[in-house]
Amino acid sequence: MEHLERCAWVLRGTLVRAAVRRYLPWALAASMLAGSLLKELSPLPESYLSNKRNVLNVYFVKVAWAWTFCLLLPFIALTNYHLTGKAGLVLRRLSTLLVGTAIWYVCTAIFSNVEHYTGSCYQSPALEGVRNEPLSKQQCHGQGGFWHGFDISGHSFLLTFCALMIVEEMAVLHEVKTDRSHCLHVAITALVVALGFLTFIWVWMFLCTAVYFHNLSQKVFGTLFGLLGWYGTYGFWYLKSFSPGLPPQSCSSNLKQDSYKR
């Protein structure tokens, strides 16, 4: 338990700062551009991380929203109820996860449709021999073809959105004080460690996407969708009264605190 608490203390000191919430979006955008330029001008040699079958990609990134949802749900419920003691307010705050799910679903559907309507089925990876019959991506692959369209980077979108959402929700830790002997302390500490490591995985894999996968325009659009999803909620809508609201900063039920305003 001592090691877990020490790890949680380090992660809190790293991710809960207001400066992190303020500058992380800019850092992600800048690293995406820098990584993309590196990929175009001086590609890195292939490595384990450039293989789409690597463990982090298969078991974490491909289900990034599921990981984020499942860890934020108990974290938001426990911390918000601890601070406010109001079940209704906790349910209201938990609706941020429904909003996030809707953003994830709509954006991925948009990306899929863009790739479909801009794509064609080819007979080889060299994009030779276009098949003229109307095919979907799935039908193309099923017939041994190769689909090529404008593939907006879903990883750039989702990893940006998930990392920023976790950092926003962890800001509540400024106010959370629990008795070390209480089971709530153990639960929150474990969730802090899990969410902290998850955030670092998302940022690291975002950087790997920048230097290994997609072209610049695909990553720009993906990252832009992630930033818009974050800012449209935490930077705009959640500041309004008719919204899930921001994480509480004090024991009052007021969710609109100045330190969260940008």
From Swiss-Prot:
Residue ranges, Lumenal side: 45-57, 115-145, 207-218
Lineage: Eukaryota, Metazoa, Chordata, Craniata, Vertebrata
Enzyme class at the top of the EC tree: hydrolase
Species annotation: Sus scrofa
Catalytic activity, EC: 3.6.1.-
Annotated function: Fatty acyl-coenzyme A (CoA) diphosphatase that hydrolyzes fatty acyl-CoA to yield acyl-4'-phosphopantetheine and adenosine 3',5'-bisphosphate. Preferentially hydrolyzes unsaturated long-chain acyl-CoA substrates such as oleoyl-CoA/(9Z)-octadecenoyl-CoA and arachidonoyl-CoA/(5Z,8Z,11Z,14Z)-eicosatetraenoyl-CoA in the endoplasmic reticulum (ER) lumen. This catalytic activity is required for maintaining ER structure and for lipid droplets (LDs) biogenesis, which are lipid storage organelles involved in maintaining lipid and energy homeostasis.
Active site per UniProt: 155, 214
TM regions (residue ranges): 24-44, 58-78, 94-114, 146-166, 186-206, 219-239
Catalytic activity: an acyl-CoA + H2O = an acyl-4'-phosphopantetheine + adenosine 3',5'-bisphosphate + 2 H(+); (9Z)-octadecenoyl-CoA + H2O = S-(9Z-octadecenoyl)-4'-phosphopantetheine + adenosine 3',5'-bisphosphate + 2 H(+); (5Z,8Z,11Z,14Z)-eicosatetraenoyl-CoA + H2O = S-(5Z,8Z,11Z,14Z-eicosatetraenoyl)-4'-phosphopantetheine + adenosine 3',5'-bisphosphate + 2 H(+); hexadecanoyl-CoA + H2O = S-hexadecanoyl-4'-phosphopantetheine + adenosine 3',5'-bisphosphate + 2 H(+)
Record keywords: Endoplasmic reticulum, Hydrolase, Lipid metabolism, Membrane, Transmembrane, Transmembrane helix
Name of the protein described by the UniProt record: Acyl-coenzyme A diphosphatase FITM2
Compartments where located: Endoplasmic reticulum membrane
Membrane topology: Multi-pass membrane protein
GO molecular function: coenzyme A diphosphatase activity; diacylglycerol binding; triglyceride binding
Family statement: Belongs to the FIT family. FIT2 subfamily.
